[in-house]
């Protein structure tokens, strides 16, 4: 794998991280990904909710959490209340139900701001990856490992990958904004 391909993979990882970040933003539609950031103390160890319970979405605005160990119900409930999701869990002794309430216009605007901030972080990360790649190619040129033509080709490849990745960020952001604003 060449230098450009290696850095292109890093750009794709930045895009994946952006999508994971978008998944944690609450919209009016229930998804299991909404709870990805929630951890529960399980034997004094912070453990991902998905590792201690089954999370299902039977309806568009309902999430059901069924822990494998019923003694975790209170801990899961506490973890959800402490999260930034603004959700009120309902514990019936067997499962926890999360009803996703409609978003207020103010909350929608806040979520759009958060989505834009995540997108900007991704763009900055992608540009930094491009800069690192170009610097590595220039070092290779100085050391005689790359010819002048190979250096130019590498710089063009980095720029092309950066442009494509930044366009993907813009597309993902537009989709997420539409999802947030239209519910």
From Swiss-Prot:
It is found in: Cytoplasm. GO terms for biological process: translational termination. Belongs to the RRF family. Responsible for the release of ribosomes from messenger RNA at the termination of protein biosynthesis. May increase the efficiency of translation by recycling ribosomes from one round of translation to another. CDD domains: RRF. Gene3D superfamilies: 3.30.1360.40, Ribosome-recycling factor (1.10.132.20). This is Ribosome-recycling factor. The keyword Cytoplasm applies. GO terms for molecular function: ribosomal large subunit binding. It holds the Pfam family RRF. It comes from Treponema pallidum (strain Nichols). InterPro entries: Ribosome_recyc_fac, Ribosome_recyc_fac_dom, RRF_sf. One of its GO terms (cellular component) is cytoplasm. The keyword Protein biosynthesis applies. Transmembrane segments: none annotated. Keywords: Cytoplasm, Protein biosynthesis.
């Amino acid at each position: 794998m060449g230098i450009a391909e290696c850095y292109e993979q890093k750009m794709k990882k930045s895009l994946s991280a952006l999508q994971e970040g978008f998944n944690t933003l609450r919209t009016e539609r229930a998804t299991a990904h909404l709870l990805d950031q929630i951890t529960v103390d399980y034997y004094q160890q912070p453990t991902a909710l998905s590792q201690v319970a089954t999370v299902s979405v039977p309806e568009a605005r309902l999430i059901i959490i069924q822990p494998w160990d019923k003694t975790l119900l209170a801990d899961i409930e506490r973890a959800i209340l402490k999260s930034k999701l603004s959700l009120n869990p309902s514990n019936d002794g067997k499962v926890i139900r999360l009803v996703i309430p409609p978003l207020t216009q103010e909350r929608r605007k806040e979520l759009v701001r958060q989505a834009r901030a995540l997108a900007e972080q991704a763009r900055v990360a992608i540009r930094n990856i491009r800069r690192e790649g170009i610097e590595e190619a220039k070092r290779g040129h100085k050391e005689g490992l790359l010819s002048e033509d190979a250096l130019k080709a590498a710089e063009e490849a980095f720029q092309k990958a950066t442009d494509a990745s930044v366009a993907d960020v813009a597309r993902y952001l537009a989709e997420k904004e539409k999802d947030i604003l239209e519910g």
